[in-house]
């Protein structure tokens, strides 16, 4: 026997022994089997002393290997019956039960025989008998020839019996004689007399007592066992269909066999045939040894009122073996008399009716009406033909049946009705003529409509009148028509049925069976085989409705062939178990038209047996966890493989037992491979999480599967162990990672060391872990346990450092506050993740320790407070903390008596508690968290995943291509993966399918009109999707934001479809367009709403899922799975704050998980959605960006938040993934809607501005943006790769360095932050900066507390929509923004246009040349126009300073200012107002609160903020900034070099080209000098000095340059003079003309915009877009990152041109989600972030745009086209505001222009950076 087989045997044997031991007396316990399956136990043996007429008893220990012979020999010695050894006795061992005895064969094993009593909890005894003993009624107990030897030898030695004994002996002999005579009367009983004789004697002499029995409490045990057996049997009836009515009890009489027993009750199913009932009855009557073939059950019909014993008038019919007694009994009408069943010997002349019918040419499946009464429904129900209702026109049947609950349709539930056609006439009509009638109501149904006749296996339909509309296969009939299986029959106008005849189907499937089958064969419509026989062996005929199913036809025939193999109960995977047949109603109810579900898995898998090992190995051993898109793919594939092996499609020839063994072997193989892979990758966190998730999910599948669960117990144990093993390894990996950053908790804020880890690193590690677990879809309960371990580790590490290192000085108020503050970040993070309970619990000791360090502990009054606060600390810990406490210089000492008191109290409380729990009281925290590992009971993916999960097909594709396997989707499956689960509620599957998918088809949703009064937005999040059968996209409410207008109104709910807004239809519009329309509404909005349209259109699941196409570049969590529903609402987090104008200023930690939103409950159908950790249970969006909707509803979904829609969570910084699982780089379809536009337009939640208290210290990279764009559509996980993160991180850093964070914002936008909603953003960015003062008690006597350690904000990367054309801003908006958007120091040729991006550099250069002249003309024009515009702007500004709500006319509301990286010439003027902005934007002044901490980094130019701004003391930023600038500078020089080389290489240059070459050479030299100069100074400058010095250096360089230029000019003056004059005149003319045109167009456009946008669009917005676009195009080279800024609150207004330093700015505006739309349009590259800036800067910034300027970032390449037109129009409007000439890069300026600039003392070098150019222009204008 193989090792596996032996183990299996041993396990089974152990189970049996365990069962025995559980019910038997301790004395008779049996030992566990050894490796050789040997076991031992004590047995009691009796010895019958015939002479004495009594029994002796002994107990001996027996081995399972001991034979009867061995035992007899031992017993002969023990009982010593023949001490004198005068005889040669022959002993036998008998097994005696109350009902009889049996002699054991000589080689039987008595202990094994005894163990077999276990089977039916029998009690018995073993009796040693001397076969030579003479028994007076000789031969009465003869058991064989040997017994007749030497009778009476022992009598010679018989002692004299007493009178009493003689009497008893006589009595026994009489009894024996009587029994002998009985035996003659009842010959069939064979050895009964012999059997019962010894039994009677032994039980009479030794009656049942606790001494003589083995069972510990026989009555209870027997009762319990009977009960269990009964329950098990009942469970079988129930398990097949969930209802108990498929089985019950039946009385079986046996008057002729056992006249003294009235009857026996047996338990039967309605499908149990008569031969089964015979076997059961024989066993009950104690005749189990008889051959059941010799017996039969007869159905006896007694006249009504007759007694069972009355023979008169009784009609008896013997049942055929395949008839079902219980079914017959149940269907027997009481008025026809009494029906009883008799067990009797089968008459030798009996011919089964089946055979009779054969002779008459009838089908063996049809039944005779047995008693001639016309009733005759004796067929098992599943063999009767039936009608199953379909829904005409795909109308949902159950909607109709809700209304007909009183009908007799064989089903009380809302399911398709199914009517069995009995062997008689069945009337159809509105009248209920008899029990068999089919009662229907509806148009066209007559009282007696038609008759269905089932005779001789043929079913016909006959209309009763000409008015009775009856159709067969669509043809109206008027005369009797024969029905064939699969035909559709319609009664009246609306009742459509499918006729199904199992016997016909079976006949075709099994042509080789009896000849009678062939009678039906010809009548069967060709081509319907597959249609009607689909799944015959299980979910009967659920395939009949699918004649069109091409893909399943092969499977169908396979199933047909296996269908009749009832031995394979539940083994056939695609079919539902045969045991389900009893509930024919449920099953037939599935037989609907092609839209009806079929109870099978959503897909099945087939693999060749020969490639089984390769297949499993590919799935397990060679799966790279990082490249799998749907992380649970292995689980689903392996489960399908198990079901395949269980099915008859896998090796149809093998027996059920072999199949079972095969399944066990396959599962064991899977498990052992999984174990190997986990061991091999035990140090790789990503792989461990992946396999932990898969092992736990597979374990759940196997455990829950009703077939697999019983046969894979060993594998289940191993899998459970594997889950735990992977868990432990993963904990170890994560703790090791965490250990590297733990010193961050002890980071002294005053030291500010760059090398030391920051708390951010800890949070990043935790976030990476959470991201990893979510990406791998690890069960929420496991996630909680894992983080409990991590929190415990943090607690243990910190606590042990505190208490074990007294010299470290950590036990002080100062360090207590620091550690507590750092822990606050962890707690806030945990709360954000829904792990607050775990954090509270496992961080409690260190939290209490830090609280102790910072609280008052100087007077006796403090003792109670200390003990109540530090209740978790034991006496040793308290003592250590207090004794090691280092007092601050002016802090009082802790009194010794206080320490003693505190310790004493702890000894009586915490210490006692620990001891009572069995823990030692010790100083240090135990590194091991003493908690048992618990396997989750629920929350598995199978509860949530519907249909074939996205990514599963891709996972299998390589295997399918190599021929290992194939995946067969089952489109008509209900879509759930729990079909085969124990107790799975199939009805609910169907019900759910019907409610969600079919319901919409029965009627249209209710349409209502809702009028909302907006305050700050509608408060809706919308999503566009196309429902089943819909041609156009619909706009659906994804959720309602709390506190918003819609929420206040109360009528809108998630799932409602928005049909129109203010009379403008939204049907068929893209999400972007709909969002735009919705934002353009006035304060009163009228919406036309189809209530619950999503559900009516089959999109219910859409509402429960995050928008699928969105990807989070900046989100470390990676995507890859459909998330449970709760996550879908996560994005509305913070809605409470955002929704109300008076939101309080909450610390980060308070942004907790959103409460369930309206409609939430309805949508969250799954238990996995809301576990103890709301966020932990969440899973990222569906891989591949497609939601797991029910098949067929390929919903094109995008998710937009309109108006106030998008109160999004903040996203975590795009930093390198802590545990990246990089995925393959092929592009997946994240954008399934037209044009590659990203999904959601979002601004950060109003209250969650990124508070970059301390910027992450990262490195910058100038190419980030372009890389991000190129990577945009790759899978989310790929974007999580380290490199990507590095880039993201660089970008963020660069942004932060400039303190206006523009890079950061753009980074997300240009990365096409394709995530519509920040559902997944873990956001530990806006951590509250709990200052120490809040941690320590405020009041006198506080000692030095650490400076508020700013939470290093992990850059909040707000998802920014790049997919939308720039929609109008919400109404009154004044965007203040000093846009650093372009981090470019370029005096370069304008970048190429969008279509040139990415072209070879030669083409780029050519494109630049083509545009150059035009740009130069622009530059001169700009200045003049800007001056005119300036006055107008100022007037508008003054007017608007008092009008918050009419700010839309403010100039350049969202000016796309170019990177203001240059030092402004007048830093002081700029700096003051900006600081004012930062300091004074207090929440109470803001209608839309923006927290101060939020604003701190949303401000102004880099220089001002870095110069002395206390908010950014960090040199990292400077490094990053300088590095970025250096790279840009180098790039500029490279570009110049290229163009110079190009020009030099030309053999003959035109005069213009020569001039250009000269200028470029100068520029190149200048840039080189500038670079050298910067290089020299960059190491030792302070940030402020750096900025000032840089300006001075640049001025000096510029002066040198000016001198050089003048010399050059003098030398070339003669030859160039004329040319310059001509050029200048031409330019002036062209510019004048152009300016006139532009001004006219500006006015025209402005008017048009105002009308179009109802006052929301301002000319300034347009100007801003145009200008910024022009500036971008002019200033950015192709590599320039397209950078965006976070918007300032909308209501924020810039300070007036010369604001009073202390004047508080007006309240900020709220961030509207539409801002995100503007990200990558050329005119909106910088729109997503605004920065406070003053009016002068605004104007200066405006000047930089030119009509063809282009944001040369790769951003332009993506989705920019729609925006371009709009942008150009808007650009034109602001042309008059642009500054003349000065806006060009230096090499594009004419020499005169340069001279003029120099003469005015302006620094041409400032042109290198956009912001400096702006500053220069600003200054120039100010001085005019």
UniProtKB/Swiss-Prot annotation:
The modification Phosphothreonine is found at residues 1211, 1232, 1330. Keywords: Acetylation, Cell adhesion, Cell junction, Chromosomal rearrangement, Coiled coil, Phosphoprotein, Proto-oncogene, Repeat. GO terms for biological process: bicellular tight junction assembly; cell adhesion; cell-cell adhesion mediated by cadherin; cell-cell signaling; establishment of endothelial intestinal barrier; establishment of protein localization to plasma membrane; negative regulation of cell migration; pore complex assembly. Residues 146-185, 1408-1448, 1523-1667 form a coiled coil. Residues 160-172 have a biased composition (Basic residues). Residues 1364-1373, 1694-1709 have a biased composition (Pro residues). This is Afadin. It comes from Homo sapiens (Human). The lineage of its organism: Eukaryota, Metazoa, Chordata, Craniata, Vertebrata. The gene is AFDN.
């Amino acid at each position: 026997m193989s090792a596996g087989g032996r183990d299996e045997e041993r396990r089974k044997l152990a189970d049996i022994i365990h069962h025995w031991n559980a019910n038997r007396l301790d004395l008779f316990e049996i030992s566990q089997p050894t490796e050789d399956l040997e076991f031992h136990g004590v047995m009691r043996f009796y010895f019958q002393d015939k002479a004495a007429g009594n029994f002796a008893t002994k107990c001996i220990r027996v081995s399972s290997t001991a034979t009867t012979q061995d035992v007899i020999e031992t017993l002969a010695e023990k009982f010593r019956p023949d001490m004198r050894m005068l005889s040669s006795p022959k002993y036998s061992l008998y097994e005696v039960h109350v009902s009889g005895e049996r002699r054991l064969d000589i080689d039987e094993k008595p202990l094994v025989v005894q163990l077999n009593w276990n089977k039916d909890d029998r009690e018995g005894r073993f009796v040693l008998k001397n076969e030579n003993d003479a028994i007076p009624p000789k031969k009465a107990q003869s058991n064989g020839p040997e017994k007749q030897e030497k009778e009476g030898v022992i009598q010679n030695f018989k002692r004299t019996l007493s009178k009493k004994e003689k009497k008893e002996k006589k009595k026994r002999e009489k009894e024996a004689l009587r029994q002998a005579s009985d035996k003659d009367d009842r010959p069939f009983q064979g050895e009964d007399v012999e059997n019962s004789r010894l039994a009677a004697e032994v039980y009479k002499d030794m009656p049942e007592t606790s001494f003589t029995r083995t069972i510990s409490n026989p009555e209870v045990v027997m009762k319990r066992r009977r009960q269990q057996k009964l329950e098990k049997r009942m469970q079988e009836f129930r398990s097949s269909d969930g209802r108990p009515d498929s089985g019950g009890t039946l009385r079986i009489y046996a008057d002729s066999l056992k006249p003294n027993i009235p009857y026996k009750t047996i338990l039967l199913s309605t499908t149990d045939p008569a031969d089964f009932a015979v076997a059961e009855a024989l066993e009950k009557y104690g005749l189990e040894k008889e051959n059941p073939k010799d017996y039969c059950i007869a159905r006896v019909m007694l006249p009504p009122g007759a007694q069972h014993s009355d023979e008169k008038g009784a009609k008896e019919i013997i049942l055929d073996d395949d008839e079902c007694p219980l079914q017959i009994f149940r269907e027997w009408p009481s008025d026809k008399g009494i029906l009883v069943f008799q067990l009797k010997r089968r008459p030798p002349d009996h011919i089964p009716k089946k055979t009779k019918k054969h002779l008459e040419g009838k089908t063996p499946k049809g039944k005779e009406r047995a008693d001639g009464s016309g009733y005759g429904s004796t067929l098992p129900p599943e063999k009767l033909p039936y009608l199953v209702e379909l829904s005409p026109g795909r109308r949902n049947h159950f909607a109709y049946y809700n209304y007909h609950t009183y009908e007799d349709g064989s089903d009380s539930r809302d399911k398709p009705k199914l009517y069995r056609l009995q062997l008689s006439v069945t009337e159809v009509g509105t009248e209920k003529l008899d029990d068999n009638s089919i009662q229907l109501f509806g148009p066209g149904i007559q009282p007696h409509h038609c008759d269905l006749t089932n005779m001789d296996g043929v079913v016909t339909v006959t209309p009763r009148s000409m008015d009775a509309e009856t159709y067969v296969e669509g043809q109206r009939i008027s005369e009797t028509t024969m029905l064939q299986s699969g035909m559709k029959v319609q009664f009246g106008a609306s009742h459509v049925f499918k006729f199904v005849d199992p016997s016909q189907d079976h006949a075709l499937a099994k042509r080789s069976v009896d000849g009678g089958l062939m009678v039906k064969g010809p009548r069967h419509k060709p081509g319907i085989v597959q249609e009607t026989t689909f799944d015959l062996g299980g979910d009967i005929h659920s395939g009949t409705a699918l004649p069109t199913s091409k893909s399943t036809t092969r499977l169908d025939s396979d199933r047909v062939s296996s269908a009749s193999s009832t031995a394979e109960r539940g083994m056939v995977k695609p079919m539902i178990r045969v045991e389900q047949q009893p509930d024919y109603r449920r099953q037939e109810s599935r037989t609907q038209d092609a839209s009806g579900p079929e109870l099978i898995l959503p897909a099945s898998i087939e693999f060749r047996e020969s490639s089984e090992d390769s297949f499993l190995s590919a799935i397990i051993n060679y799966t790279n966890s990082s490249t799998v898109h749907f992380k649970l793919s292995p689980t689903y594939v392996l489960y399908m493989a198990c079901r395949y092996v269980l099915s008859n499609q896998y090796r149809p020839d093998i027996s059920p037992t072999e199949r079972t063994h095969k399944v066990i072997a396959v599962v064991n193989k899977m498990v052992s491979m999984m174990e190997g892979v986990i061991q091999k990758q035990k140090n790789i966190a990503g792989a461990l999480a992946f396999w932990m998730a898969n092992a736990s999910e597979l374990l759940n599948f196997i455990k829950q599967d009703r077939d697999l669960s019983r046969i894979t117990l060993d594998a289940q144990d191993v899998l459970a162990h594997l889950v735990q093993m992977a868990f432990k390894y993963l904990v170890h990996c994560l703790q090791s990672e965490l250990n590297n950053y733990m010193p961050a908790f002890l980071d002294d804020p005053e030291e500010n060391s760059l090398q030391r880890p920051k708390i951010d690193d800890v949070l990043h590690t935790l976030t990476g872990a959470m991201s990893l677990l979510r990406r791998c879809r690890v069960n929420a309960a496991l996630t909680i346990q894992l983080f409990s371990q991590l929190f415990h580790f943090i607690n243990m590490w910190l606590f042990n450092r505190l208490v074990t290192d007294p010299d470290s000085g950590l036990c002080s108020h100062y360090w207590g506050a620091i550690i507590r503050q750092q822990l606050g970040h962890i707690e806030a993070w945990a709360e954000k993740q829904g792990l607050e309970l775990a954090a509270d619990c496992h961080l409690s000791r260190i939290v209490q320790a830090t609280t102790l360090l910072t609280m008052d502990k100087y007077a006796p009054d403090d003792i109670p407070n200390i003990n109540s606060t530090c209740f978790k600390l034991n006496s040793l810990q308290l003592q250590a903390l207090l004794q090691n406490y280092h007092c601050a210089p002016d802090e009082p000492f802790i009194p010794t008596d206080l320490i003693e008191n505190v310790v004493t109290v702890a000894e009586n409380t915490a210490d006692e508690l620990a001891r009572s729990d069995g823990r030692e009281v010790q100083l240090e925290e135990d590194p091991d968290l003493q908690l048992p590992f618990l396997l989750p009971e629920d929350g598995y993916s199978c509860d949530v995943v519907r249909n074939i999960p996205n990514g599963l097909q891709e996972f299998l594709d390589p295997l399918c291509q190599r021929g290992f396997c194939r995946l067969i989707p089952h489109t008509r499956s209900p879509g759930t993966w729990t079909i085969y689960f124990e107790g799975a509620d199939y009805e609910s599957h169907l019900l759910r399918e019907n409610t969600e998918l079919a319901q919409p088809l029965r009627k249209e949703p209710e349409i209502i009109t809702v009028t909302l009064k907006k305050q700050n937005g509608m408060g809706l999040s919308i999503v566009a999707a196309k429902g089943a059968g819909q041609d156009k996209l619909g706009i659906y409410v994804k959720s309602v934001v709390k506190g918003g207008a819609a929420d206040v109104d109360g009528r809108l709910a998630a799932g409602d479809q928005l049909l129109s807004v203010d009379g403008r239809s939204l049907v068929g519009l893209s999400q972007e367009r709909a969002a735009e329309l919705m934002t353009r509404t006035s304060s009163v909005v009228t919406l036309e709403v189809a209530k619950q349209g999503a559900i009516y259109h089959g999109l219910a699941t859409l509402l429960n899922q995050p928008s699928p196409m969105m990807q989070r570049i900046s989100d470390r969590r990676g995507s890859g799975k459909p998330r449970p529903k709760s996550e879908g609402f996560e994005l509305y987090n913070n809605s409470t704050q955002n929704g109300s104008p008076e939101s309080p200023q909450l610390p980060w930690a308070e942004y907790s998980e959103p409460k369930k939103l309206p409609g939430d409950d309805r949508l969250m159908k799954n238990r996995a959605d809301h576990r103890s950790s709301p966020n932990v249970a969440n899973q990222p969006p569906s891989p591949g960006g497609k939601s797991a909707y029910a098949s067929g509803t390929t919903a094109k979904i995008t998710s937009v938040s309109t108006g106030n829609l998008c109160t999004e969570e903040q996203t975590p910084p795009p930093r390198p993934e802590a545990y990246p699982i990089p995925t393959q780089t092929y592009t997946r379809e994240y954008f399934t809607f037209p044009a590659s536009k990203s999904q959601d337009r979002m601004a950060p939640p109003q209250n969650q501005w990124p508070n970059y208290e301390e910027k992450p210290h990262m490195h910058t990279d100038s190419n980030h943006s372009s890389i991000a764009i190129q990577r945009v559509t790759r899978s989310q996980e790929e974007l999580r790769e380290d490199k990507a993160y590095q880039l993201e991180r660089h970008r963020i850093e660069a942004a932060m360095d400039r303190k206006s964070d523009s890079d950061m914002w753009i980074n997300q936008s240009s990365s096409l932050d394709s995530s519509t909603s920040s559902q997944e953003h873990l956001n530990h960015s806006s951590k509250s900066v709990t200052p120490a003062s809040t941690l320590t008690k405020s009041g006198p006597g506080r000692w030095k507390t650490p400076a508020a350690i700013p939470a290093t904000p992990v850059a909040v990367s707000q998802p920014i929509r790049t997919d939308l054309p720039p929609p109008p801003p919400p109404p009154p908006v004044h965007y203040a923004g000093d846009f650093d958007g372009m981090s470019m120091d370029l005096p370069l040729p304008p970048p190429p246009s969008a279509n040139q991006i990415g072209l070879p550099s030669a083409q780029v250069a050519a494109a630049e040349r083509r545009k150059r002249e035009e740009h130069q003309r622009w530059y001169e024009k700009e200045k003049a126009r800007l001056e005119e515009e300036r006055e107008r702007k100022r007037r508008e500004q003054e007017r608007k300073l008092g009008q918050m709500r009419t700010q839309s006319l403010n100039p350049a509301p969202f000016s796309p200012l170019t990177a203001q990286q240059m030092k402004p010439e007048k830093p002081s003027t700029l700096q003051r107002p900006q600081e004012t902005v930062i300091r004074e934007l207090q929440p109470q002044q803001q209608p839309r609160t923006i927290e101060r901490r939020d604003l701190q980094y949303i401000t102004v130019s880099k220089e001002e903020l870095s110069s002395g701004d206390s908010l950014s003391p960090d040199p990292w930023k400077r490094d990053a900034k300088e590095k970025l600038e250096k790279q840009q500078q180098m790039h500029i020089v490279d570009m110049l070099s290229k163009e110079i080389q190009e020009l030099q290489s030309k053999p003959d240059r035109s005069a213009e080209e020569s001039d250009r070459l000269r200028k470029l050479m100068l520029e190149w030299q200048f840039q080189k000098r500038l670079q050298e100069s910067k290089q020299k100074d960059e190491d030792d400058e302070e940030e402020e000095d750096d900025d000032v010095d840089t300006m001075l250096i640049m001025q000096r360089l510029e002066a040198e340059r000016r001198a050089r230029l003048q010399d050059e000019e003098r030398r070339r003056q003669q030859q160039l003079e004329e040319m310059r004059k001509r050029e200048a005149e031409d330019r002036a003319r062209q510019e004048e003309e152009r300016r006139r045109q532009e001004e006219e167009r500006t006015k025209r456009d402005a008017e048009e915009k105002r009308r179009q946008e109802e006052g929301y669009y301002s000319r300034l917005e347009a100007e801003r877009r145009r200008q910024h676009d022009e500036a971008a195009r002019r200033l950015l080279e192709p590599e320039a990152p397209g950078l965006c800024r976070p918007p300032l609150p909308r209501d924020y207004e810039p300070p007036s041109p010369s604001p009073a330093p202390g004047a508080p700015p007006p309240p900020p505006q709220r961030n509207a989600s539409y801002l995100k739309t503007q990200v990558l349009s050329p005119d909106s590259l910088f729109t997503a972030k605004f920065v406070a800036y003053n009016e002068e800067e605004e104007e200066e910034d405006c000047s930089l745009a030119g009509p063809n300027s282009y944001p040369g970032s790769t951003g332009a390449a993506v989705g920019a086209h729609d925006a371009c037109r709009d942008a150009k129009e808007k650009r034109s409007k602001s042309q008059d505001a642009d500054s003349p000439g000065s806006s060009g890069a230096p090499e594009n300026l004419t020499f005169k222009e340069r001279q003029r600039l120099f003469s005015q003392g302006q620094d041409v070098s400032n042109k290198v950076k956009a912001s400096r150019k702006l500053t220069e222009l600003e200054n120039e204008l100010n001085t005019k």
